[in-house]
From Swiss-Prot:
Its main location: nucleus. Second step of mRNA capping. Transfer of the GMP moiety of GTP to the 5'-end of RNA via an enzyme-GMP covalent reaction intermediate. The gene is rnp-2. The active site is at 66 (n6-gmp-lysine intermediate). GO terms for molecular function: ATP binding; GTP binding; mRNA guanylyltransferase activity; RNA polymerase II C-terminal domain binding. It comes from Neurospora crassa (strain ATCC 24698 / 74-OR23-1A / CBS 708.71 / DSM 1257 / FGSC 987). This is mRNA-capping enzyme subunit alpha.
Length: 402
């Protein structure tokens, strides 16, 4: 049985729920959210394109840093005995049970009572603790709230209201708990923090202050529309910005090993005339996910460019001793426009969908640099101020006159 205490692996943050329990939990979450689907309900961003500069001028957006962690929904619920339990839900829709008594989320006016039917959106990261020679601590960084105490009306409220509910009803009572019982912190699975949000024109603040002060890796910015409701699945109003050269794609990798002719000596040793050479660098094909819309009803479509694997990289991959065939891999373009292996994405069931691939490729071809974002900030701010003034005037007109 796992003991309470900080998690050490953000990819395996607890005990994975067995299939039958996971199905039951998925149905619970769908019921709370009023959905017929039991699939992963989390919102997913689209890649930032040049057209989105106009979107930032036209609509109210918040901006935060894009953490290089793992996305989870935190589900606060009860077990069959009525005891407080929590699960982390990953993008594969697997449920990870946090060890009992490793977390507590008290109600605002009762430190013993706890939240249930509550779904929080965030990202799990490992922060490096300053002055500890590299010691890591897990943090759950919150950026949205889907449901509070079995009520999902929040889904239709704007982002600032959703975050306001999280702060008032969950985060402030949680912070008071830590202040009252600091001796319990070492036994907690992770610390919870609210992700710092700036108004969309606070881009310079993000680049100059927020990102340099982070204790974890960050690989871009996320812009989220203030006024739109929470959207299950791909949300066109959540914009993921990366510097054009840092854009990556998730593919399914398939390796084709060369056939070689046996030498005379190998034939004498009993080798067949031709055999597969698993030592040489294989041809690595990349495939994108297309649901059932691929060629001939296939789920996958061959990406036009292969994965380039250097000799030394192949030696490293072989030395891992792990299965390589058909794994999901995150790839980036190098200076010579070759796709290179960045990391394995075992946290994902599928490669990027063909629509995502098209979106990211457009971002790479027509990407917006950090300098262009900074230059756009002034116009974004001016437009925001004009909208804010109009809202203020409308509110004044609607007030009853005495």
């Amino acid at each position: 049985m796992e003991q309470p205490g900080p998690i050490t692996d953000i990819a395996k943050p607890g005990i994975k729920a067995p299939r039958d329990l996971a199905i039951s939990l998925r149905e619970e979450v769908a019921r709370i959210l009023g959905r017929s689907s039991i699939g992963f309900p989390g919102a997913q961003p689209v890649s930032f394109a040049r057209k989105h500069l106009e979107e930032l001028r036209r609509e109210d957006y918040y901006v935060c840093e894009k953490s290089d962690g793992i996305r989870y929904l935190l589900y606060l619920t009860v077990d069959e005995e009525g005891q407080e339990v929590q699960y982390l839900i990953d993008r594969k829709n697997d449920y990870w049970f946090l060890p009992r008594n490793s977390m507590h989320f008290p109600m605002p006016n009762d430190i013993q009572a706890f939240h249930r039917g509550t779904i929080i959106d965030g990202e799990l990261v490992m922060d490096t603790v300053p002055g500890t020679n590299g010691r890591k601590e897990p943090r759950f960084l919150v950026f949205d709230l889907l449901a509070l105490d079995d009520k999902a009306e929040l889904l239709n409220k704007p982002l600032d209201k959703r975050l306001g509910y999280f702060s008032a009803y969950i985060y402030e009572p949680y912070k008071k708990l830590l202040q009252q019982f600091p001796q319990e912190i070492p036994f907690m699975a992770f610390k919870v923090e609210m992700k710092r949000m700036e108004l969309s024109y606070g881009i310079e603040t993000m680049f100059r202050e927020v990102i340099p002060a982070l204790k974890h890796d960050s690989d871009g910015l996320i812009f989220t529309c203030r006024t739109t409701p929470y959207h299950f699945g791909t949300d066109p109003h959540i914009l993921k910005w990366k510097a054009p050269h840092e854009n990556t794609l998730d593919f399914r990798m398939r390796l084709n090993f060369p056939l070689v002719q046996a030498t005379e000596a190998e034939l004498d040793e009993g080798f067949p005339e031709q055999f597969t050479d698993y030592d040489s660098v294989p041809q690595a094909e990349l495939y994108v996910f297309c649901g059932n819309d691929g060629p001939g009803g296939s789920k996958y479509e061959l990406f036009p460019d292969p994965l380039y694997i250097a000799e030394d990289e192949w030696e490293t991959l072989k030395a891992l001793g792990d299965p390589l065939q058909d794994r999901v891999v995150e790839c980036c373009l190098d200076a010579e426009n070759r796709w290179r292996l960045f990391r394995f994405r075992d946290d994902k069931n599928e490669a990027n969908h063909t629509s995502t691939v098209s979106s990211v490729m457009a971002s790479i071809r027509d990407g917006v640099s950090d300098q262009e974002l900074l230059s756009a900030a002034t116009a974004i701010k001016e437009s925001w101020k004009i909208r804010a003034q109009k809202r203020k005037e409308q509110q004044q007109q609607q007030q009853p006159k005495h």
